[in-house]
């Protein structure tokens, strides 16, 4: 058995491991990790689908939310619309955060080849931060994306394990006669490419993936949306709560699936936190060993401008003084 080098137990080794990776490297590598986790989740969905209790034998569990809220199966499509709206709003917010970053570093506003009155100003103007401005604006868009994607990857990975461990009877009408998966490879690819919309899986109950993304958008706008416009917080809060209602009222998930997902998402997003170095160093350990997708050292600034270090010796200084 090979003996680990002594340097691994020294302080210098762990200091190197705790040295933050460039933000650009984190963006690329954590996105790659998220794609890998999406494939893991797709496989877990297939396993859960096969392990789901027979609906003809096992009836849905008693649920207080089902007793209080009237059943409207079509509302699950409305929940998807809520998620789609929040996806668009989050992309818009991230772009506005990028404009705030450009304003912070002294770059001008971007310009379109053809100026469209009103439209160009709405999309390309800098909306100066008025709330939650204690957050440093430099690289705020990059750090916000790292925080969002790492939180999402962690939640999907834990969901892949939790929903396989315990199989619950599905309360959804579509899963009372669950469809058979004919082509497993095609199903996995469709699940990843369409974020689950291109395939039907049953039994993936604990916990709700739709609730995870709704709550992630809620937390994203609660922290960063307020930096763009004050109205984003109340709007996203109302949309997210309505989305929770749609999930339970459509009977696609038990109430516990939604409540647990809300708690875990909020706790994970807070634990990851906002840091000028990006993700916590413990998470960076998982991507530090990747042989591709960015450098491990900060040889350039995060704005992409090379840092030039000039060292003058004594003879050069004397020569310049004489000239």
Curated annotation (Swiss-Prot):
The keyword ATP-binding does not apply. Coiled coil: none annotated. It is found in: Membrane. The active site is at 210, 253, 257. It is a multi-pass membrane protein. Disulfide bonds: none annotated. Residues 48-73, 169-211, 255-257 are extracellular. One of its GO terms (biological process) is ceramide biosynthetic process. Its main location: membrane. The chain crosses the membrane at residues 27-47, 74-94, 148-168, 212-232, 234-254, 258-278. Keywords: Kinase, Lipid metabolism, Membrane, Sphingolipid metabolism, Transferase, Transmembrane, Transmembrane helix. Residues 1-26, 95-147, 233, 279-323 are cytoplasmic. Pfam families: PAP2_C (PF14360). One of its GO terms (cellular component) is Golgi membrane. Its EC number is 2.7.8.-. One of its GO terms (molecular function) is ceramide cholinephosphotransferase activity. Belongs to the sphingomyelin synthase family. Bidirectional lipid ethanolaminephosphotransferase capable of converting phosphatidylethanolamine (PE) and ceramide to ethanolamine-phosphorylceramide (EPC) and diacylglycerol (DAG) and vice versa. Direction is dependent on the relative concentrations of DAG and ceramide as phosphoethanolamine acceptors. Does not function strictly as a SM synthase. Essential for viability of the pathogenic bloodstream stage of this human protozoan parasite and, consequently, can be considered as potential drug target. PANTHER family: SPHINGOMYELIN SYNTHASE-RELATED PROTEIN 1, SPHINGOMYELIN SYNTHETASE. This is Phosphatidylethanolamine:ceramide ethanolaminephosphotransferase. It comes from Trypanosoma brucei brucei (strain 927/4 GUTat10.1).
